[in-house]
Amino acid sequence: MSEYTVFMKDADEKTYEELAKIPGLRIGEGRVVGRIDACAAAARLLGVKAPPQLQPVDLPLPDGLRDYQVEGVKRLNAIVKEMGGALLADDMGLGKTRQATALAAGLTKKSGRVLVVCPAYVRETWLDELSKWGERSVTVIRPGNTKRHVRAWEEAKTAKWVVCSYEMAGKVYEECFYDAPRALIMDEGHLVKGRDAKRAKKLEEIGKFATYRLLMTGTPMWSRPRDFYQLLRILFGSAFGTKFNFDVRYCGGRINDWGGLDNRGVSNAEELQHRLSYYMVRREKRDVLKELPPLTRQVIWCDPTAEATREFQAAMRGFGAGAVSDALNATLRGKVEPVLDYAQQARRFLLFTYMKEHAHQIAELLRTKRDTPCVLITGDLPVEKRASLIAQARSSGQGVVATIDSAGAGLNMQGVASVGIMHAIDWVPLKLAQAEARLHRMGQTEPVQWVYFAMRESMDSVVVRNVVEKLGQWAAIMGQQSNRDLMDTLGDTVDGRTEKDVLADIYRDLQEGGDNGDED
């Protein structure tokens, strides 16, 4: 035991290649294991299970699945049989819904029911997918109190498949599942985060009683490594320890000057990546869709007009969170004209912005001042109408103007355009990745170019650096090349200053009454 204690003191500094060379590890007094590979060595040192081996699959796999999807279902089946849950984190556009449907259909072939929890905007996607499979016992719960809605609630008490939104999951479970579901599927599962969130607690409760749990998301680490924890807890219980231990181990957790825990960083990334591989299936488009057309990116830094500079400086002289919001709005207004120029030239495009006010303004200016027809999608548009507008744009050749929160995820827009325009660079980098994937996915035949518009001497100088930092954390843990490419594209356009340095320079210039110097 003393040898093991000595070894563990510096185990954190050893690479997995070094661990693999150890002929035996003393993991308990009087018990020695033989030579093991790096993965198993890490598993034993960390107290977690080794990766489950692929087992012969007794699932009814339908025709039409691609080879990588068949392999994905096999792997998921092995993981859920071993661990009780699995994380399906394939890149956007690789058919996660189809794989999840195949898995759940197989797991409930003889008996059992499936509860699918998803954002409202993908309810119809699930209904379409289940219909393609020939599933007849499907009930979709929608908000409302008409006779049709009341009938759906009654049907949900016996239906094999029940599909509902995250907001309604708790009520659906309590009123329609007298016996726990055999399979619980959480689509766009990154929406479940925040240890104290009511939604997360309810899903954790449901998950404890479900036989199998599957969480689907192309962006499991929504912003920072700390976002993983709640997802992992719902799927695997205490396998990753307490939230505090997770933050300290993997999120660079440290006590700050105010006595709180700062968990915004990343630490032991290789170790976390290794552990996640036991529980997760993840493939990139570039690795499995060889026929997918290329994706390129460009960043265009716009010079601010005198009016934009005045608005931005006036906003930054304010105080509190409102000042940041005002500064972001000033930045977005300052980029409208160059964005209009680019969209007018492209004619067919997908344009994302941040707020519906900006989306309405851009769409109106394109239609009335630039002779550029387009459809408009914002959050106040009913979910059912969004897909029809996309189909209209695809058939008519019109552009699409949308807010990133209303159309940046869950909607298939391949064939709508080959040019994507990012008017607003979101603080959450994985929103950008999801938005890019609306075009760059199965069914797209033309090369896709995404153009990011940023304005010098504005909040974009801060936001871009913040996004680059977060993408670096993602790449360290997930090892995903496409997000590393986005990080490099944005990072190559800025200098070595941190976002704090840039903010300090902005405030210093304001105090001195002058303008910023050349940016980037």
Predicted regions located by residue number:
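A conserved SF2-helicase RecA2
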Residues: W427-E436, H440-E519
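Conserved P-loop NTPase motor "coupling/switch" region that bridges the ATPase
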Residues: K147, K157-T158, A183, A200-K285, ...
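Conserved helicase ATPase core of P-loop NTP-dependent helicases/translocases
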Residues: R148-A152, F352, H360-Q361, D371-A407
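SF2 helicase motor core recognition
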Residues: G170-E174, S223-P225, A359-A363, R386-I390, ...
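Conserved helicase/translocase motor-coupling segment
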Residues: D287-T368, R386
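Conserved pre-motif I regulatory segment
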Residues: P51-A89
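Conserved helix-turn-beta segment of the N-terminal RecA-like "Helicase ATP-binding" lobe
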Residues: V122-N145, L235-A239
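Conserved Walker A/P-loop ATP-binding site and its immediately adjacent core
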Residues: S111-K132, W222-D227, M355-K356
